[in-house]
Amino acid sequence: MARDSLSDAGLHFDELNKLRILDPDVAQQTNELKEECRDFVDKIGHFQKVVGGLIELVDELAKETENEKMKAIGARNLLKSIAKQREAQQQQLYALIAEKKMQLERYRIEYEALCKVEAEQNEFIDQFNLQK
């Protein structure tokens, strides 16, 4: 009966017969909730560490990807410039070939003219020798 009157006043005895303000069931549930919260906080901390590690890994991969992308762009630009250089060099060579063909044609015409002059001079010499 004394316990009931104390319970009505909000005072309770625990399993060690200590006087408590909270009901022993509520105190036990509070302790269980406290432990669950502690476990939850530990799990959240572990989760944050794992997520932090994943974020760092993704950041590193992003940096590596960006570096490789820049290398690929540089290589592509280099190939384009080499192709343009080769095309320019090819055009220069075509121009040189055309120039050499024109020079060859001039030399051929000059050779034919010189052959004609030589033939005329030989004919003149032969006629001159015959007249003597």
From Swiss-Prot:
GO terms under cellular component: acrosomal vesicle; centriole; cilium; cytoplasm; Golgi apparatus; intraciliary transport particle B
Coiled-coil annotated residue ranges, if any: 87-114
Keywords from the named record: Cell projection, Cilium biogenesis/degradation, Coiled coil, Cytoplasm, Cytoplasmic vesicle, Cytoskeleton, Differentiation, Golgi apparatus, Spermatogenesis
One Pfam family per UniProt: IFT20
Localization per record: Golgi apparatus, cis-Golgi network; Cytoplasm, Cytoskeleton, Microtubule organizing center, Centrosome, Centriole; Cell projection, Cilium; Golgi apparatus
GO biological-process terms attached to the record: cell differentiation; cell projection organization; regulation of platelet-derived growth factor receptor-alpha signaling pathway; spermatogenesis
Keyword Cytoplasm: yes
UniProt keyword Coiled coil present: yes
Stretch forming the signal peptide: none
Chain's role: Involved in ciliary process assembly. May play a role in the trafficking of ciliary membrane proteins from the Golgi complex to the cilium. Regulates the platelet-derived growth factor receptor-alpha (PDGFRA) signaling pathway. Plays an important role in spermatogenesis, particularly spermiogenesis, when germ cells form flagella.
Alphabetized PANTHER family for the sequence: INTRAFLAGELLAR TRANSPORT PROTEIN 20 HOMOLOG (PTHR31978:SF1)
Annotated protein name in UniProt: Intraflagellar transport protein 20 homolog
Organism: Xenopus tropicalis
Species lineage: Eukaryota, Metazoa, Chordata, Craniata, Vertebrata
